[in-house]
């Protein structure tokens, strides 16, 4: 009975002690992040760095509408295909939109020379002025300028390009022509023209009365002489003949001279260009809506300040960098491991060793105390604020460094440049892989550092308490300390703010420590006596049992006993 009382007394003394635990915040967040060493680490807070949403719409870019080519493409718009008349008034735009299967390009069959380079030039143009470079009525007095073709029909009638003139003989002659234009627009001027290649000598004579015709075009930066290639060809768009289309950019103050004895498709209108670095050309089936954005992709517009996106590599405006990642999330909080909180006889709660506290909501790190006046949480505001400031600055720095927003347009290649296009794709893929790898590695490293940083802060807080309490309390192995003295709320606050008075509680702690140690020693002595008694009693019972069995077996003849003297 005495032993039982001593054990209960010891249990009461041990459990009734005042305690203080060091812990960290936990919540019901479902956020997870990856680190260098772990995947899907549950955390209390994190920020997403990867935009994966768009609205599926074409929008105005910073309030400026795009130029929608509709059923026309760049060729049809610039040459002036009669089916593209609605585009003639176009003056300015934020970007240009083509559809994947635009029908109306060059209505008369032929090749547009260096077309891909022209598209590249137009991708940086945000406005133009269409003007009459060679007035129709006065520029070609000795030639007929009303050439039309069924291939460029409009409303059921033969027609021709709105920006070019098909010059043919006047009467029976095609006298040599010479005409020039001086660029006085103060900006680059896009000049377009063509050369007709008949299918036979008879057609050549019929149109130009000159079997040895040529076309010459010259400026400071351009100088070419063309001769018609007369040959039989398969019929395309009801035509055996072909027209090749050419262009050049005329610098301010420069002069362009046209000279021909036949076959010239002369410029009628030209374009003075104004460049804008955020412009571009996209190919998209998305429809236009009344909306505004600062970043447009062929899939839809993006309104995001995040540094990365995985929606589309082609972007126009202030856009996040495209990467192939599916997840880029940076941790800003702590590991989220809510402890299994239970209330025992005295309402005990564990410290950081057994997980975080959902009950502490006003800080990242802090304390839980328990004494005669009750229990409660208190955040350590200083360490929490320092951590928040450090992590916020780090996240902002990462976003600022990686958030170089820009336009990324596709490069143009013609059908004869497939090897170059394939090589370019491989190079672009290589750069994209590097960007993706760098972005993912950066996030993984920073996540690892942040979580280690939090672990260190909790450990420092624990060491701070330990260095104050010394032997006035004992570590009980779960992030908590058990006082050897009574510690009221004022005492607890002094531990938290670093002003704990160790000498004040030393004597009481010493007495209680000795008392607990004495109870432990006495209970150990009682346990030893009980153990010896139990062993002896068990042995006697065993011997008596063996004797009884032997006597029974001897009496019924199952066992014979012989005693030899």
From Swiss-Prot:
Positions of the record's site feature: Cleavage: 343-344
Provide the topology term for how it sits in the membrane: Single-pass type I membrane protein
In this UniProt entry, which residues form the Cytoplasmic topological domain(s)? 550-565
Taken from the record's topology, the Extracellular segments are 18-528
* Compartment(s) where it occurs, according to its Swiss-Prot or TrEMBL record: Virion membrane; Host apical cell membrane
> Which GO terms fall under biological process for this protein?
clathrin-dependent endocytosis of virus by host cell; fusion of virus membrane with host endosome membrane; fusion of virus membrane with host plasma membrane; viral budding from plasma membrane; virion attachment to host cell
| An annotated GO cellular component | virion membrane
- Return the Pfam families for the record: Hemagglutinin
Give the signal sequence positions. Answer: 1-17
The record places the lipid (S-palmitoyl cysteine) at: 554, 561, 564
Quaternary structure, per UniProt, is:
Homotrimer of disulfide-linked HA1-HA2. Interacts with human CACNA1C.
What family does the Swiss-Prot or TrEMBL record give for this protein? Belongs to the influenza viruses hemagglutinin family.
By what name is this protein known?
A: Hemagglutinin
Q: Which organism is it from?
A: Influenza A virus (strain A/Wilson-Smith/1933 H1N1)
Per the UniProt record, the lineage of the source organism begins with: Viruses, Riboviria, Orthornavirae, Negarnaviricota, Polyploviricotina
GN (gene name): HA
């Amino acid at each position: 009975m005495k032993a039982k009382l001593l054990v209960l007394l010891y249990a009461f003394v041990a459990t009734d002690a005042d305690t203080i635990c060091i812990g960290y915040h936990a919540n019901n967040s479902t956020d997870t992040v990856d680190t260098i060493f772990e995947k899907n680490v549950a955390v209390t807070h994190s920020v997403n760095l990867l935009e994966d949403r768009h609205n599926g719409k074409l929008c105005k870019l910073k309030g400026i509408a795009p130029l929608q080519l509709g059923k026309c493409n760049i060729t049809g718009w610039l040459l002036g295909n009669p089916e593209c008349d609605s585009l003639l008034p176009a003056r300015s735009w934020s970007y240009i939109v083509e559809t994947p299967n635009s029908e109306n390009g060059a209505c008369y069959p032929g090749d547009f020379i260096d077309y891909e380079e022209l598209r590249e030039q137009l991708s940086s143009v945000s406005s133009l002025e269409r003007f009459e470079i060679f007035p129709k009525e006065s520029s070609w007095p000795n030639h007929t300028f009303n050439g039309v073709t069924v291939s460029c029909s409009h409303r059921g009638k033969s027609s021709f390009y709105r920006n070019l003139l098909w010059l043919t003989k006047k009467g029976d002659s095609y006298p040599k022509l010479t005409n020039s234009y001086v660029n006085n627009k103060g900006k680059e001027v896009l000049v377009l023209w063509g050369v007709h290649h008949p299918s036979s000598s008879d057609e050549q004579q019929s149109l130009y009365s000159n079997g040895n015709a040529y076309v010459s075009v010259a400026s400071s930066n351009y100088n070419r002489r063309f001769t018609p290639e007369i040959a039989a060809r398969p019929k395309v768009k009801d035509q055996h003949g072909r027209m090749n289309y050419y262009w050049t950019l005329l610098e301010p103050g420069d002069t362009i001279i046209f000279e021909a004895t036949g076959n010239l498709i002369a410029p009628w209108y030209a374009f003075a260009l104004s460049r804008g670095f955020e412009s571009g050309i996209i190919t998209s089936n998305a429809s236009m809506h009344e909306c505004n954005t600062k970043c447009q992709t062929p899939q839809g517009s993006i309104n995001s300040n995040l540094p990365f996106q995985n929606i589309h590599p082609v972007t126009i405006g202030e856009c996040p960098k495209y990467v192939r990642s599916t997840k880029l999330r940076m941790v800003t909080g702590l590991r989220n491991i809510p402890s299994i909180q239970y209330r025992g006889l005295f309402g005990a709660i564990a410290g950081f060793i057994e997980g975080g506290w959902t009950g502490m909501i006003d800080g990242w790190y802090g304390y839980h105390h328990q004494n005669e006046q009750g229990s409660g949480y208190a955040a350590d505001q200083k360490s929490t604020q320092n951590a928040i400031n450090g992590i916020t600055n780090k996240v902002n720095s990462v976003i600022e460094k990686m958030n170089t927003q820009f336009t990324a347009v596709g490069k143009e290649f013609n059908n004869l440049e497939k090897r170059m296009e394939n090589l370019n794709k491989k190079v672009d893929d290589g750069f994209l892989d590097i960007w993706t790898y760098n972005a993912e590695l950066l996030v993984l490293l920073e996540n690892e550092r942040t979580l280690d940083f939090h672990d260190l802060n909790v450990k420092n807080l624990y060491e701070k308490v330990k260095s104050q309490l010394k032997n006035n309390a004992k570590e009980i192995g779960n992030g908590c300390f058990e006082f050897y003295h009574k510690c009221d709320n004022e005492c607890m606050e002094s531990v938290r703010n670093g002003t704990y008075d160790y000498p004040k509680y030393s004597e009481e702690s010493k007495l209680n420590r000795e008392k607990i140690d004495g109870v432990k020693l006495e209970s150990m002595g009682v346990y030893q006596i009980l153990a010896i008694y139990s062993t002896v009693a068990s042995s006697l019972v065993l011997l008596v049992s063996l004797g009884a069995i032997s006597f029974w077996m001897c009496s019924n003849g199952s066992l014979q006993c012989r005693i030899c003297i």
